[in-house]
Each structure stands twice: as C-alpha cells, then as structure tokens.
From Swiss-Prot:
Record's miscellaneous remark: This protein shows ATPase activity.
Species name: Brassica napus
Pfam families assigned: Cpn60_TCP1 (PF00118)
GO molecular function: ATP binding; ATP-dependent protein folding chaperone
Transit peptide: 1-55
GO biological process terms held by the UniProt record: protein refolding
Database matches in PANTHER family: 60 KDA HEAT SHOCK PROTEIN, MITOCHONDRIAL
Native organism taxonomy: Eukaryota, Viridiplantae, Streptophyta, Embryophyta, Tracheophyta
Name this protein carries in UniProt: RuBisCO large subunit-binding protein subunit beta, chloroplastic
Entry's localization field: Plastid, Chloroplast
Transmembrane residue ranges: none
C-alpha cells in the first residue's frame, strides 16, 4: 500500500502523517545519549556514481593482408554502386525510403550517404572513401562520383604495390607530391569560361540536359555571374525561371489600410523615404517631426520598426485614410541579432541611419537626415521588396565584402546560408528556378540534377573550365613522368606511377557505362596530341570536346584529384582496424 507524505516545513522537509505517534521518550533518550550527540541518527546516503559501461572492441590486424582486403572490398562496393551514375549514359540508383515512396537518384554523394554495409570492417572502408565525395560536394558542389571512382583507382593500384612489399609511407608521400604537382598543371590547362559556355557546363553536369543548361545560363545572365540563383520545387510539370529585383524579405504590411492598389492588395511607392527604428514604436508623438517633414516634402514614407503598438498604428492609418500622408509600415525582418543585421543592410542599401538608443539616437528628435531613399517599394500581405536607387553602390560593395568574410569564418551550413541570403538581397537581384516534374519521385531526382548543374556553373565561374568527359584527368597522366624526375627516391616514384595509372579510371568507367571498351577509348584519345580531342560518350564520337560543349569546371576536377589522393593516403597508411563487437539482439 502506498504511503502518503505531507509537506509541513517551510523549507520543504516532508513528514509522514503518523509521525506524531512516535514514542517521545525513545526520541528523548536518543537525543540525550552520547550516541545521539556525537553522531547523526539519520546519516545522509551517499550517491553512488553511475557505472561506466564500455563496449568491447574487436581488433583486426593486417598480418596476412585480410584486413586491407576487407577495407578494399568496402571501397569497391561503394564505388561500384556510385559508379553506375557516371557519365551521360550513367544509370540511376533506387534508394529505399522508410517513409514514403522510394527515391530515384543520379547523384553520387546522395547514393554514398545511404550506404551502410553489414560487415563493420567493410563499412569503415566505404566510410573512408565517402569522405572524398562529401568534401568535394562541400567545396565544389559537383564531381562526387568522379572523386569516389578516382579514390578507388588510387587505392586499388596502391594496395597491389604495398602487398608486394613497398613502404607505404614513401608510397603515400609520392602520391601526395604528384597530386600537388598535377594541380599546378591543371591550372595551366584551364581557361576562363565564356558566357556562351555556361549553358554547356550546366548541361553536362545535369546529365546532358540542354533545357536545364539554358535555364541556368539565362538565370546567371539576368542576375550577373556573382548574383544569387536559388532553387524551388515548382507546382507544375514544367520548369520556370523568375527574377526578384531588389531586396525582398518575408514581412508584409502591418495593416491592410495602407494598401494603395486594392486589386493587387499591395502598397506601391516610387521615390520613397524610409525610417528605420530598431525598437518598438509605442507613442505616435515620437513620429510627429518625421511625419510633418513628409507632409511638407510631399514624399511617401515607409516605417520599418521592431513593432508598432496599436495607438501609434491608429494615428498612421487615420492620416493615410484622410490623404494627409502617403505612408506604410511593416515589422523588421528577422529576430534578435539577425533583425538588427537586416536593418543595417536596409540602411546601407537606402542610405538611411537606424534609430538606436544605444548609439544616442532617439525617435522623437529624428529629422530628415536619418531617412533613407528607395527608387521603389512594393509591399504585399506577406512580402516586401525595396529597390535601391544605385547611389549607395560603393557602401553596398563594402558591406558585401564584410559578409563574405563572415561566411569564411562561419562553421554551420545554416549560418552560411543566411549570410549568402543577405548578400543576395544587397546585390539587388535573386534568380529563382522552379523545378517542375510529373511525380514527387521525379521531382526530387530532377532537383538534385539541377542543383549539381548550378553548383558546377558557379565553380566554372570561380576557377575556369577544362575539357570534360574524364579526358583532362587522362591527359594529366602524361605529365607524371616529368614530375617523377623531381621526386626523392624510387618508392616515391612508384607512388607517382600509382597516380598515373589511376587517372584513367574515370574515363574508362564513362566509356563502360556507354557500352564501349574503356581501355580502347583511352588509347585512342591519347593517340591524338590535341588536348581538346576526346570521346563524347553521349554521341559515341571522337571529336573536339570543347567545341561540342563537353566541359568540366576546373575547380571540380581539382577537388576530385586532391580529395581522392587524400583518402588513398589515409587508406594505404592503415594497418589495423578497431570495431565495436555487436551485442546479440535480445530474444523476444
């Protein structure tokens, strides 16, 4: 039977209801005894520290070569799975989903992330090579499949040499030095991308989809090479492109009484002044000076504040309805620190000064000198757009540079995304591509392709372009012999030879996926000294790939080479694997 307790003490001690029945004589004896005086009758219980349970580990030593073979088996399983997507005739991979319909993808890094192998040692091998794909995706946004295939090549060729007794330390040093030298050679082969070539770069990355390539090229031409292009899931089966001009954010007018166009239910002002307040406006009297200036000047005014209380808002609405003022108000975008940053961005775009008490500015003493100016302002129920007049271009560029420095220091992807958003808003234009499809499964697959194409185009703008189709990597192999001469010893030169042989793997796999012999294709490509000559897997022809639009961004090829070499170095230096012993599942 459960006992009940009643709290009686002001400090929260609890006494049982029948405690008063305790024999008082007994208690007096205890309290007067030497035992009771010297020792606590009710000693505190010591809390026992929780036991630390460590899972047992299983050690796999590479004495007979079985551990490395298992690791390599994991690498091969992942690379073979991802490899089927490589090239214009690569296939799709169907991924099971716990919830909802299966996903059909053609994106290497998405496939790699889903792979978990049953054997723990093989799984570690797969995870190692997955790092090459993930890192390439983070830096270049494309080329993930090539990274995995190239890493597989480095590892396969390296394992053969190490198994024959070569020193893995010197071998990996040779791989590292050769890869570094080849990056320098790659930059010499690169050329700046022309506007007419942007569509080709995007199309190749999207699986030779000319429509996607043209749309991305058009988006970049409309917002500029350094403009911001974003993706959205469309509602129809067709792709669509539109450009949002000016600074747009998800905040609408605070009252529908401010509407100037009753059909569109929007507020539209030309040559508008802006008052920015980084606090809540509680008293309409604080606005008298600014509003009187607006009446005398005959200009429309937009107030952006943290919030506007009912009394102050009513005063603004009444003056607007009477026709005394052309006015509108909205709440500042964002929250907390981000809200203040947005207000500062708007101030720089419009030439305004933000009213802040911390810097000694008060609303009641504000005059025309703190107001900003916008060429156009459009407010709807949910969004607001401010188009600058171009007079603050230098200040905007300085602000963009500051934000770019913050992006380099930012660690979280979410923070980087928000900072990029701010750059887009300040730059005065965002192109939005709406990806359309017939079904949700097709939409997800198509969106991944468009995302890859967009990232590849941005990478091409950054570092230029080279010949695509795996031919640039194959041509780099011919530069290895000259690099070997500068290496310190024979084993480092063996490492260089490993790189030389592995560089043909991507081209051979592209050819294999197109149904032809990779070795024959690579020999025929190398037989022609023209660096632009190569195999077009989409048409099955040998031709000038640059003229045919088969182009890769230099940044993507560089990242593939660097990250594949890094993963191979880690792999070949490994000699022992530690994994957790799986606990047996409880019998139901």
């Amino acid at each position: 039977m459960a006992s009940t307790f009643t709290a009686t003490s002001s400090i929260g001690s609890m006494v049982a209801p029948n405690a008063h029945k305790t024999d008082k004589k007994l208690m007096n004896k205890l309290s007067s005894s030497s035992f009771g005086r010297r020792q606590n009758v009710f000693p505190k219980l010591r809390r026992s520290s929780p036991a630390v349970v460590c899972a047992a580990k299983e050690l796999h030593f590479n004495k007979d070569g079985t551990t490395i073979r298992k690791l390599q088996a994991g690498v091969n399983k992942l690379a073979d799975l991802v490899g089927v997507t490589l090239g214009p005739k690569g296939r799709n991979v169907v991924l099971e989903s716990k919830y909802g319909s299966p996903r059909i993808v053609n994106d290497g890094v998405t496939v790699a992330r889903e792979v978990e192998l049953e054997d723990p040692v093989e799984n570690i091998g797969a995870k190692l090579v997955r790092q090459a794909a993930a890192k390439t995706n983070d830096l270049a946004g494309d080329g993930t499949t090539t990274s995995v295939v190239l890493a597989q090549g480095f590892i396969a060729e390296g394992v053969k040499v190490v198994a024959a007794g070569a020193n893995p330390v010197l071998i990996t040093r040779g791989i590292e030095k050769t890869a570094k030298a080849l990056v320098a050679e790659l930059k010499k082969m690169s050329k700046e991308v022309e506007d007419s070539e942007l569509a080709d770069v995007a199309a190749v990355s999207a699986g030779n989809n000319a429509e996607i390539g043209s749309m991305i090229a058009e988006a970049m031409s409309r917002v500029g090479r350094k403009g911001v292009v974003t993706l959205e899931e469309g509602k129809s089966a067709e792709n669509a492109l539109y450009v949002v001009e000016g600074m747009q954010f998800d905040r609408g007018y605070v009252s529908p009484y401010f509407v100037t166009d009753s059909e569109k239910m929007s507020v539209e002002f030309d040559n508008c002044k802006l008052l920015l307040v980084d606090k809540k406006i509680t008293n309409a009297r604080d606005l008298v000076g600014v509003l009187e200036d607006a009446i005398r000047g005959g200009y429309p005014i937009l107030i952006i504040a943290e919030d506007i209380e009912q009394e102050a808002l009513a005063t603004l609405v009444v003056n607007k309805l009477r026709g005394t003022l052309k006015i509108a108000a909205l709440k500042a975008p964002g929250f907390g620190e981000r809200k203040s940053q947005y207000l500062d961005d708007i101030a720089i775009l419009t030439g305004a000064t933000v009213i802040r008490e911390e810097v000694g500015l008060s609303l009641d003493k504000a005059g025309k000198e703190v107001l900003g100016h916008a060429a156009k302002v459009v407010l709807t129920k949910e969004t607001s757009t401010i188009v600058g007049d171009g007079s603050t271009q230098d200040a905007v560029q300085k602000r963009v540079t500051q934000i770019k420095n913050l992006i380099e220091q930012a660690e979280q992807d979410y923070e980087k995304e928000k900072l990029n958003e701010r750059i887009a808003k300040l730059s005065g234009g965002v192109a939005v591509i709406q990806v359309g499809a017939q079904t949700e499964t097709e939409l997800k697959e198509k969106k991944l392709r468009v995302e890859d194409a967009l990232n590849a185009t941005k990478a091409a703008v950054e570092e230029g372009i080279v010949v695509g189709g795996g031919c640039t990597l194959l041509r780099l192999a011919s530069k290895v012999d000259a690099i070997k001469a500068a290496l310190d010893n024979d084993e480092e030169k063996v490492g260089a030879d490993i790189v030389k042989r592995a560089l043909s793997y991507p081209l051979k796999l592209i050819a294999k996926n197109a149904g032809v012999n990779g070795s024959v294709v690579s020999e025929k490509v190398l037989s022609n000294d023209n660096v632009k000559f190569g195999y077009n897997a989409a048409t099955g022809k040998y031709e000038d790939l640059m003229a045919a639009g088969i182009i890769d961004p230099t940044k993507v090829v560089r990242c593939c080479l660097e990250h594949a070499a890094s993963v191979a170095k880690t792999f070949l230096m490994s000699d022992c694997v530690v994994v957790e012993i799986k606990e047996p599942e409880p019998v139901p």
